[in-house]
């Protein structure tokens, strides 16, 4: 009977973890684009034949059927002249129906953003669309351009870095150019340098180009690197006829996870085709049979291994201890699942090793204490410094955070996210091990009158851009799509070079990319009041726009040097809320007065643009807030015109007394900005 209960609990564990392993990466397209209205192409009049043809072409997109290769060549009009020509192209991993939807949206927005322009192009995250009054099919075009850089340069092995980068891109260029008339795309990896052991890249041309034109277009793009972004650990370049990308982390799907191309049509009497199909397992049908057989076998084997481990563990422990520490069963399953991705061997850390590293968790090594435990500085025997988070044994919420951080952070790799080095399970002990961040958290600098004088505008702008890239990775580019839910200054750690790293994923939530246009709800609201979006604080409704709101608050805090205390302060109960104050100054055209007086240098136009972006992020309506993809575009491209912000959501204090919010074990402080359920992040 006891074994039956163990097996039942095991299934409950598996069901709990399935969302983490089954949520495949799916890209979306509903992001504000990078427009370029080609001024050199001239203009047309609203009542011209070209205007009618262009509008007709865009309208006809809604009646098209999706194509298998993500490429659309379109034209509208008769032979009398003033025909409209257009091309649409999607990234390789975008599903067919999503691709067509992306191009439809891009086309509609492009003619709205570039009215009466003869030629224009727009790049979305996952597709591009261009139109012209001249034939563009089969003709290489390398202007205009759009580019993004990571903002971080390689600090050593520069020559080797540049050589291996170009070597990888050149190899991908050759593969893409030879791709044939349906698709000219290549993705792949290559050897890197110390600190970045693997390089990743992609190259893409519109398939209407000849092999030579595709090659020339990409070469033209590669030649841009030395003048703008040599040594950058990440970059993207977009041209009307081609694009390429280089990163030090895998940003693309594996080939096996991509939607397969349709089989090539062979003549019915082709013996070569028949023989090839037989040798490959009767084509697609054979692979489906193999998948149908292999998947159940894998799950049965996984179940058998888990069950054996569970029963062996149970045999060596008393029943009372099992009941008292039931979550260790779930954690054993987590280890097995991590082993599937070759993480567990390197992530599991022995308890005695951590005791030695922290001098038996000495109070002298304690960096901070939060609602779910303490954080200690430690040093491994090899000299590596670490931050050790020891969760409280009595905190049920700590269990939840522990599982979250292992399952998420173990598979998240980004320069602007804190890195999980390992974890430990020893009886009642639950311990997480992180990289050690020397400069502690952002709040220690930005809210300290003396320390924030060390932060010139260049450093603050780097912080804003780094946090934006980290959130964009969580929302769009990571293996999982994640809503952080507790972004705040104390959860932004700063390394030795003041690069920001997002920390504390205990409250993070996975979300299904098929449902990104809708909101999710929770009856248990957790987070920090000053950074909570109103729809989340009041109704428990959250989405990626919840993180965008928190980011906007953070941007305004970084620029003003003030905390968002929701209309209260320690010395003045009638103090004006930070967002309210900034909004009032914006409306009264005295916005320069909100800039931190210690910011004596730096581009005022750049600072004002960041305030503008911050106000867009804290708008009351979630639908009005930009996505992080859009924010990254706003920060990197001054050609993008910022929309006018609407009223921020700053009147939260009126609803706070009636809200059922999870609280930490710490007493509430005077500032509502500090009311939080999050523990102190590793430093």
UniProtKB/Swiss-Prot annotation:
Signal peptide segment: 1-24
Region (Disordered): 263-283
UniProt KW Chaperone keyword: no
EC number(s) stated in the UniProt entry for this protein: 2.7.11.-
Family annotation (SUPFAM superfamilies): Protein kinase-like (PK-like)
Catalysed reactions, semicolon-separated: L-seryl-[protein] + ATP = O-phospho-L-seryl-[protein] + ADP + H(+); L-threonyl-[protein] + ATP = O-phospho-L-threonyl-[protein] + ADP + H(+)
A GO MF term: protein serine kinase activity
Residues that bear Phosphoserine: 490
Location of the protein in the cell: Membrane
Extracellular topological segments: 25-288
GO CC field: membrane
List of residues that carry Phosphothreonine: 528
Glycan-modified residues: 43, 47, 73, 153
Topological domains annotated Cytoplasmic: 310-683
Positions annotated as active site in the UniProt record: 486 (proton acceptor)
Modification Phosphotyrosine occurs at: 434, 536
Gnk2-homologous domain boundaries: 32-136, 142-251
Topology of the protein relative to the lipid bilayer: Single-pass membrane protein
Name of the top EC class for this enzyme: transferase
Domain spans labelled Protein kinase: 361-641
Transmembrane regions: 289-309
Family label: Belongs to the protein kinase superfamily. Ser/Thr protein kinase family. CRK subfamily.
Official protein name in the record: Cysteine-rich receptor-like protein kinase 28
Organism ancestry: Eukaryota, Viridiplantae, Streptophyta, Embryophyta, Tracheophyta
């Amino acid at each position: 009977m006891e074994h039956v209960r163990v097996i039942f609990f095991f299934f409950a564990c598996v069901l709990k973890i399935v969302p983490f392993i089954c949520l495949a990466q799916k890209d979306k397209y509903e992001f504000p684009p990078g427009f370029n209205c080609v001024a050199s192409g001239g203009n047309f009049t609203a009542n011209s034949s070209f205007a009618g043809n262009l509008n007709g072409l865009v309208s006809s997109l809604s009646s098209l059927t999706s194509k298998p290769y993500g490429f659309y060549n379109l034209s509208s009009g008769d032979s009398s002249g003033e025909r409209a020509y257009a091309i649409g192209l999607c990234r390789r991993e975008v599903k067919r129906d999503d691709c067509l939807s992306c191009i439809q949206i891009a086309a509609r927005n492009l003619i709205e953003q570039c009215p009466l322009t003869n030629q224009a192009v727009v790049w979305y995250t996952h597709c591009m669309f261009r139109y012209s009054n001249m034939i563009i099919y089969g003709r290489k075009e390398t202007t205009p351009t759009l580019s993004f850089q990571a903002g971080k340069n390689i600090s050593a092995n520069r020559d080797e870095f540049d050589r291996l980068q170009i070597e990888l891109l050149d190899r991908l260029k050759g593969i893409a150019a030879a791709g044939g008339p349906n698709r000219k795309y290549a993705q792949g990896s290559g050897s890197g340098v110390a600190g970045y052991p693997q390089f990743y890249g992609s190259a893409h041309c519109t398939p209407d180009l000849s092999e030579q034109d595709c090659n020339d277009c990409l070469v033209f793009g590669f030649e841009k690197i030395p003048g703008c972004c040599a040594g950058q650990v990440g970059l993207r370049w977009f041209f009307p006829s081609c694009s390429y990308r280089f990163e030090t982390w895998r940003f693309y799907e594996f080939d096996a996870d991509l939607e397969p191309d349709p089989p090539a049509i062979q003549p019915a009497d082709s013996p070569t085709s028949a023989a090839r199909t037989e040798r490959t397992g009767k084509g697609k049908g054979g692979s489906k049979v193999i998948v149908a057989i292999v998947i159940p076998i894998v799950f049965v084997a996984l179940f058998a291994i888990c069950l054996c481990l569970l029963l062996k563990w149970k045999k060596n422990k008393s029943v009372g201890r099992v009941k008292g520490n039931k979550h260790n069963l779930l954690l054993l399953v987590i280890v097995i699942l991590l082993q599937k991705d070759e993480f567990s061997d390197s992530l599991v850390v022995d308890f005695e090793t951590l005791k030695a590293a922290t001098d038996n968790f000495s109070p002298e090594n304690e960096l901070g204490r939060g609602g779910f435990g303490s954080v200690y500085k430690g040093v491994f025997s090899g000299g590596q410094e670490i931050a050790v988070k020891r969760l409280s044994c009595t905190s049920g919420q700590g269990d939840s955070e522990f599982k979250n951080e292992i399952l998420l952070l173990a598979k998240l790799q980004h320069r602007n996210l804190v890195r999980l080095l390992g974890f430990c399970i020893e009886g009642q002990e639950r311990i997480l091990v992180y990289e050690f961040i020397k400069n502690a958290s952002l709040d220690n600098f930005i809210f300290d009158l003396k320390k924030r004088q060390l932060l010139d505008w260049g450093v603050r702008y780097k912080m804003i851009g780094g946090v934006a890239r980290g959130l964009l990775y969580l929302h769009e580019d990571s293996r999982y799509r994640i809503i952080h839910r507790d972004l705040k200054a104390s959860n932004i750690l700063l390394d030795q070079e003041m690069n920001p790293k997002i920390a504390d994923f205990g409250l993070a939530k996975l979300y299904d990319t098929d449902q990104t246009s809708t909101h999710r709800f929770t009856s248990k609201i957790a987070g920090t009041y000053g950074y909570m979006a109103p729809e989340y604080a009041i109704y428990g409704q959250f989405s990626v726009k919840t993180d965008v709101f928190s980011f906007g608050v953070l941007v305004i805090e970084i620029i003003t040097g003030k905390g968002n205390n929701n209309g209260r302060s320690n010395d003045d109960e009638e103090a004006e809320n930070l967002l309210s104050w900034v909004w009032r100054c914006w409306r009264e055209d005295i916005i320069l007065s909100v800039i931190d007086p210690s910011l004596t240098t730096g581009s005022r136009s750049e600072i004002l643009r960041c305030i503008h972006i911050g106000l867009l992020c804290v708008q009351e309506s979630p639908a009005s807030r930009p996505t992080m993809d859009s924010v990254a575009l706003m920060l990197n491209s001054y050609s993008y015109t910022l929309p006018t912000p609407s009223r921020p959501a700053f009147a939260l204090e009126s609803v706070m007394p009636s809200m059922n919010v999870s609280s930490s074990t710490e007493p509430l402080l005077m500032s509502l900005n500090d009311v939080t359920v999050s523990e102190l992040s590793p430093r």
